[in-house]
Amino acid sequence: MAKEKEHINLAFIGHVDHGKSTLVGRLLYDTGVIEDKDLGEGEDKFRVIMDTLEEERERGVTIDLAHTKFETDNYEFTIVDCPGHRDFVKNMITGASQADAAILVVAADDGVMPQTKEHAFLAKTLGIDQLIVAINKMDLVDYDENRYEEVKQEVAELLKTIGYNVDEIPFIPISAFEGDNVVEKSDNTPWYDGPTLLEALDNLEPPEKPTDKPLRIPIQDVYSITGVGTVPVGRVETGVLEVGDTVRFEPAYTATGGRKGEGEVRSIEMHHEEIERAEPGDNIGFNVKGVGKNDISRGDVACHPDEPATVVTPDDTFIAQIVVLQHPSAITAGYTPVFHCHTAQVACKFEELIEKIDPATGEVIEENPDFLKTGEAAKVRIRPTKPMVIEEVSFIPQLGRFAIRDMGQTVAAGMCVKIEKEE
């Protein structure tokens, strides 16, 4: 059996209407994943795929995942999310769809737009280090090299201020609708001698599996299976889980004073097959002896007792760096929205606004600001209203990032930079 190709999770980011859905459709079509019968009519022929996914998501239908995977010579790609999707920003942050790389789509006619900036900033904040810039809709500017260079320059300046190394980022003139430079090299851009989009994807670096870090498995669901017992389900973020290991679930264990939430792993299952060991990226169900279905819940994190997950209780605080994405008025001290961190959702209080920061450079603009408005970044002190697991982003980034939600929208995004345990 041939070794499976390495796997990369890919996000498509960029301003609304710059052609992300069309590009996804074009990629899937040109790589043979979808056929003519899957396409729509006229201008929207490629968008249909993403629109269908969108509707299925909205209705809560299980998505046909075959339509979100494609292969290059070196890799198998999964398209983890497409913006435009209501919860895109939340998903991007909470790791429901942790991307390893992203394609930033910028329309040649519009250039950089507000969401171009927001998505690029988020990608950097979320640790997406590998970026490819697709300058799309070249057909609308008659494949003009000068216009391409203008937009390229504009995007490069933006990415530099955010902290990307622009020399390592491929910029590619494409037309998703016409198919130029997506999979096939285009005759319409004789002035361009770089890779096609597919070639650039094939040149990405594979993500490193953090197997040497302590075990962390945020729990998505807990099932009770007759004849088996309690089966928590989740994705291994860091470390390795083996049959026979003792695992502890936090904050369940701490919250019950150690009475509940620890047991022995009897079996591990992935894709309906039993496995002996699970690594980062594996979505697994595992049976734990000595843990009842009601002892643990979504938002708990499985870890090894000798390297337990960090629990922050209402007696503790943590310092976070956040950026306000959309707040109707302003955030002040005392504000208590819901923090979505890995699979946990916990109301947390803004204890103190420490300093306002320039989102591009990270420099301090103002000490102890009175409030924070949309577009501003800050360092803040946060106190959870109940125990939760969160890690410092420098230690375990997968569990250090969060989205802040209120009024049905993502208000802010951020990361935990320092945990302050009560002495």
From Swiss-Prot:
**One Gene Ontology MF term:** translation elongation factor activity
Q: What class of enzyme is it?
A: hydrolase
What are the GO cellular component annotations? cytoplasm
Q: Where does GTP bind?
A: 14-21, 81-85, 136-139
Spans annotated as G2: 60-64
Region annotated G5, chain positions: 175-177
State the EC number(s).
3.6.5.3
Q: Where in the cell is it found?
A: Cytoplasm
Question: Which residues are the signal sequence here?
Answer: none
Name the catalysed reactions.
Answer: GTP + H2O = GDP + phosphate + H(+)
UniProt-annotated stretches for the region G1: 14-21
Positions of region (G4): 136-139
Which key words are in the record? Cytoplasm, Elongation factor, GTP-binding, Hydrolase, Magnesium, Metal-binding, Nucleotide-binding, Protein biosynthesis
Q: Does the keyword Protein biosynthesis apply?
A: yes
Keyword Protein biosynthesis set for record? yes
The ranges of region (G3) come to 81-84
Task: Indicate the segments forming the tr-type G domain, all copies.
Answer: 5-211
* InterPro entries per the UniProt record, alphabetical: EFTu-like_2 (IPR004161), G_TR_CS (IPR031157), GTP-eEF1A_C (IPR054696), P-loop_NTPase (IPR027417), Small_GTP-bd (IPR005225), T_Tr_GTP-bd_dom (IPR000795), TRAFAC_GTPase_members (IPR050100), Transl_B-barrel_sf (IPR009000)
Domain of life, per the record? Archaea
Query: Which positions are annotated as binding Mg(2+)?
Result: S21
Transmembrane stretches in the record are none
Family, similarity comment: Belongs to the TRAFAC class translation factor GTPase superfamily. Classic translation factor GTPase family. EF-Tu/EF-1A subfamily.
Free-text function comment from the UniProt entry: GTP hydrolase that promotes the GTP-dependent binding of aminoacyl-tRNA to the A-site of ribosomes during protein biosynthesis.
What is the name of this protein?
Elongation factor 1-alpha
- What is the species listed in this Swiss-Prot or TrEMBL entry? Methanopyrus kandleri (strain AV19 / DSM 6324 / JCM 9639 / NBRC 100938)
**Lineage of producing organism:** Archaea, Methanobacteriati, Methanobacteriota, Methanomada group, Methanopyri
